[in-house]
């Protein structure tokens, strides 16, 4: 007997969705930024919040023009919302991962149907690098989310 994600009841599907979200949320707020990139991004975001200078990211007093500022803006905005750097520095990557999963599912559903959409989301979620980047404070996951949004 063949089973597919389409055979799941709505309750089971919601349980699966909650399980995916819980897996991505696991450990949020339990670690400090890790070298090499994460501390630099957090320092630039902290400087934005402390000085009110959001247009040109800085690390301390030095202009930080090595990377696009979007990720640091998102980290700083996350801090304004949650008031905890332990959570705020990882929140943009987590939200971008959830957005990417949703956009992938919606696009696949529109193009090929619900069954294919379910497998597309599951296939993306079980990719190790996708989950690792969703739990890192690096630009990559936000770039993936924005690229997926542009294709959607």
Regions found by a protein language model. Give the residues of each.
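Membrane-integral, polyisoprenol-dependent glycosyltransferases
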Residues: 2-152
